[in-house]
C-alpha cells in the first residue's frame, strides 16, 4: 500500500453525483475504489467508531462488492485497545499532570463549599438562596474548563443519590450538613488523557454509619494499594475486596447478584485515552489479565445503601511504570468531613 491524498485522489462530490445523492452508495463506491487501488485482498480488518446500524449497512454493501476481500472485525479487546492498554513513561507523566490538575479542581470545590454560610442544616448562597447540587456542578465545570480540561459530566451525588453508584446527582437538591456526598470526577486534558478520582465528603460532620462505611472502604483501599504489583492477576484484587466486605457482613455482587446494597460493582478499570479501558479489576469469567508495566487503572472500592440514605467510595488512579514501580497519579487528601464554620 502507499499513502495518498484522499481529497485529490477521491472526489467525494463526484461520488455523490455518480450515486444520485445517495450518501450510503457514495461511501460504498469510494471505499471500493480505495480497496481496489491499494490492492487489498484476503482478510481486511475493520476498526473505528461508527454508529452500529450505519456500520452494518455500509459494510454489508461493501462486502458484496469485494470479490477477493473478506471484511472481518473483532469483538471486545481489539488490536487498538490492546495497544492502548499499556502506557509508556511519557504517557504516564501526561496522566500524572492530568491527576494534578484534577486535584486542583477538587480542592477548589472543597473551598467553594466551605466558603458558604450555614442556615439550619443547609448551605446558603450570598443571595440568601439555598446552595444546590446544580450550583456545585456548575462551579465544578467552570473550574475544569478554567484549567484547560474538558468533561462531559461528573458525579456529585448526595444522600440517597450517593447510594446509587452512577447517580450523577439531583440538580435542585440543597446541600445539607451530615449527608454523604460522592464526588466522582473524570476530566480530560488537552493531550487526550483522562484522570479518574472519587472522594466522599460530609459537610460539617459524618454520621456514625457513614463514618464506619467510609473507614471500611479506606481500609481495603489502603491494603489494595500496598499489595498491588506487576505480575499479579487483576481478578485477585476484586476477589480480595469481595472477601473483605463479605467478612464484614456486607452484601456483594458475588453473594447477592443484582442487589442494590453493599459492594455492587467491580474494583476498577483501565484509564487512558478513554475513561474505560483494559485491564479490568474484575472476577468476570475470562478475565486472565496480569498486571503489567504500563497499566494505568482506577481502584475504587465503595459501599452503597440507598434506603439508608448514603453511599461512600474512595478512588485513585494508579500507574505501573516501565520498571514496574507503582505510582499514584491522584493528588488529593482523603478527608471525609469538610469543616463548616458557622458565620
What are these regions (language model features)?
Residues 1-343:
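Active-site neighborhoods and metal-handling regions in enzymes and metal-associated proteins
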Amino acid at each position: 500500500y502507499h499513502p495518498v491524498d484522499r481529497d485529490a485522489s477521491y472526489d467525494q462530490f463526484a461520488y455523490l453525483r455518480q450515486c444520485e445523492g445517495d450518501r450510503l452508495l457514495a461511501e460504498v463506491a469510494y471505499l471500493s475504489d480505495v480497496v481496489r487501488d491499494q490492492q487489498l485482498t484476503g482478510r481486511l480488518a475493520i476498526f473505528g467508531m461508527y454508529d452500529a446500524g450505519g456500520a452494518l449497512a455500509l459494510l454489508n454493501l461493501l462486502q458484496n462488492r469485494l470479490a477477493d476481500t473478506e471484511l472481518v472485525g473483532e469483538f471486545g479487546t481489539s488490536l487498538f485497545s490492546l495497544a492502548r492498554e499499556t502506557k509508556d513513561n511519557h504517557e504516564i507523566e501526561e496522566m500524572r499532570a492530568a491527576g494534578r490538575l484534577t486535584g486542583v479542581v477538587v480542592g477548589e470545590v472543597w473551598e467553594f463549599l466551605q466558603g458558604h454560610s450555614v442556615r439550619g442544616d443547609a448551605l446558603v448562597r450570598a443571595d440568601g438562596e439555598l446552595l444546590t447540587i446544580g450550583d456545585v456542578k456548575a462551579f465544578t465545570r467552570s473550574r475544569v474548563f478554567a484549567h484547560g480540561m474538558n468533561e462531559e459530566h461528573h458525579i456529585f451525588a448526595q444522600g440517597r443519590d450517593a447510594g446509587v453508584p452512577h447517580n450523577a446527582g439531583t440538580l435542585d437538591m440543597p446541600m445539607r450538613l451530615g449527608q454523604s456526598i460522592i464526588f466522582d470526577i473524570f476530566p480530560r486534558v488537552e493531550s487526550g488523557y483522562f484522570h479518574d478520582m472519587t472522594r466522599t465528603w460530609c459537610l460539617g460532620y459524618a454520621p456514625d454509619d457513614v463514618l464506619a462505611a467510609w473507614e471500611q472502604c479506606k481500609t481495603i483501599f489502603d491494603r489494595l494499594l500496598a499489595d498491588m504489583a506487576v505480575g499479579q492477576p487483576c481478578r485477585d484484587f476484586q476477589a480480595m475486596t469481595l472477601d473483605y466486605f463479605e467478612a464484614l457482613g456486607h452484601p456483594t455482587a458475588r453473594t447477592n447478584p443484582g442487589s442494590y446494597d453493599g459492594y455492587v460493582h467491580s474494583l476498577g478499570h483501565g484509564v487512558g485515552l478513554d475513561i474505560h479501558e483494559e485491564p479490568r479489576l474484575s472476577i468476570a469469567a475470562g478475565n486472565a489479565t496480569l498486571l503489567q508495566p504500563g497499566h494505568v487503572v482506577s481502584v475504587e472500592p465503595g459501599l452503597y445503601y440507598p434506603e439508608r440514605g448514603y453511599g461512600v467510595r474512595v478512588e485513585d488512579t494508579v500507574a505501573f511504570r516501565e520498571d514496574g514501580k507503582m505510582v499514584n497519579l491522584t493528588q488529593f487528601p482523603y478527608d471525609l468531613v469538610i469543616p463548616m464554620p458557622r458565620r
